[in-house]
Amino acid sequence: MLPLIELDHVGFEYISPDGQTFQALRDMSIKIEEGEYIAIVGANGSGKTTLARHFNALLLPTSGTVLVAGRDTRERLNHPAIRKTVGMVFQFPEDQIVATVVEEDVAFGPENLGLEPVEIRKRVDDALKEVDLWEQRLRPPHLLSAGQLQRVALAGVLAMLPRCIVFDETTAMLDPAGRRMVLENMDRLHRNGMTIISITHFMEEAARADRMIVMSHGEIAMDGTPQQVFSNEEQLTGLGLDLPPAARIARGLRPYLPELGDGLLTTESLIRAIPSFKGLSEKFKYPLTLVEENSRAKPLISVKNLAHTYLSGTPLSYRALTDVSIQVDEKSAFGIVGVTGSGKSTLLQHLNGLLLPQEGTVKIGPYDMSEPKLDIKAVRRMVGLVFQIPETQLFEQYVGDEIAYGPRLLGVKQNLREQVRWAMEMVGLDFDSYKDRLTFTLSGGERRKVALASVLSMKPDILLLDEPAAGLDPAARRDLLLKLKQMQAQGLTLVFSSHQMEDMAVLAERLTVLKDGRDTLTGSTGEVFSQSEKLKELGLEPPVVTRVAEGMRKLGWPLNSGITSRALLIEEVGQLIGAGIR
């Protein structure tokens, strides 16, 4: 039986208009069988997306051959059949949304197959219900959040009934509930016989697959089951990747709990393997650790009773924010979380004047954003914003020029090169290697780094980040969060939104949770994450380490509530074991 997809010594080069080449794939040979569930992982720029676009002939190999169900992708007459066989959900959903109404976009593919209207209607309805977008079916896609756009794109592919779906970072922009739904859909589709190929930076997602392919510099570095790949931590780390969070926690706890064996890759399997606590006594129960309020902290951002309606007075009117109030202190790190469509991006865009208050007040340092004579340029010099999708703010041809654009507008001349170098180093881009790279040859993660560097190069006092680590590989994510903490320590005020609770646990000191445009829960990171049932009601969940600690508390372990770091969990367990309490 033929493999569903077969690559034989495939190479691929990107070629710029001026003749420059960039080798993205090198001599790759792989076979993908019908019904497999494969995760493809690798550092930013390793060639994952380039590889994926060969699976349905969006890219054609520079050398070697790609066969899909026995059809050569270089034969253009084969392309319709190939693209009916292999569907793809892109990293950025805007790349594949073509219609002005959600249900019309989902219908686009089936219509091009020449199906009967009744069959098209059934496929569209089934796909929209599958991704929980039935209520949004008549809305324009441009009014949806990024996470909702991802689900529109997925629905469009599902409506084609392909034999294989390639998910290219499909969950990167989704909230925990939406992400869980997509992963469950992937599992269900796989159980029903569909071939699933998942490109991801989330190691816990990769652990769900039957097979993992690890890429590095356009080549296959590792290929095996998740257990085989994750058992070689040293090689994995050297490739810019990491173990799943649960596996890292298990490794840290193993010196104290040797019964925790290898291969614990998921939160659920780890909690099941942890022994119950013995000899529990009330005297060992800890109180909730609260973060003390700093009465001397200086408020830098004040939002009171803010409301915003898109397309007010039209049939498409949509209330994005209602009565939102937050305060961000100078030199602090403030996180905004919530499900997709909860108003996070809308709130952030009020903090540098991209949107102005319709109701309520927003004050940024000395600036009242409702003031008729507001110096908006001064506000934007003070406040930098990195958008959720970096392509929306990249427009120069070369990386160096992109990052230098802002400082040039501010009149920086004498130290421009050094300022650009500093910004690139802060996000982990080597100056000499990247300054002359063409922006269109960059991976999604590399573009995100360039977008961040282009804002940092202007030396703002406040940095707003909309999903700052989305699309970054584990090493780049870890490095970025560390550098943001260092910048905060040097006096930068951070305000950021994210669906990744692990990032919030590392970086945020205080959080506010938005639900349907309202601030429903605000407090220190530990306080918010300790309220797991409330978070579940809001469509969120605490980070893995908090969930593991909560599971241990249910087993009788007298641990602090609201633990947000792996080091703290391991320290507390070590103290209990060392004291002979268990």
Question: Which stretches of residues belong to each language-model region?
Answer:
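The feature captures the beta-strand-to-loop junction immediately N-terminal to the Walker
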Residues: 41-43, 337-339
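Helix-to-loop junction immediately C-terminal to a conserved catalytic motif
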Residues: 56, 352
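ABC ATPase NBD Q-loop/coupling interface
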Residues: 65-81, 361-378
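Conserved ABC ATPase "signature" region
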Residues: 118-136, 415-433
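Conserved ABC ATPase signature
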Residues: 140-144, 148, 438-442
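Catalytic Walker B motif of ABC-type/P-loop ATPase nucleotide-binding domains
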Residues: 165-168, 463-466
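Conserved ABC ATPase "signature" C-loop
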Residues: 218, 516-517
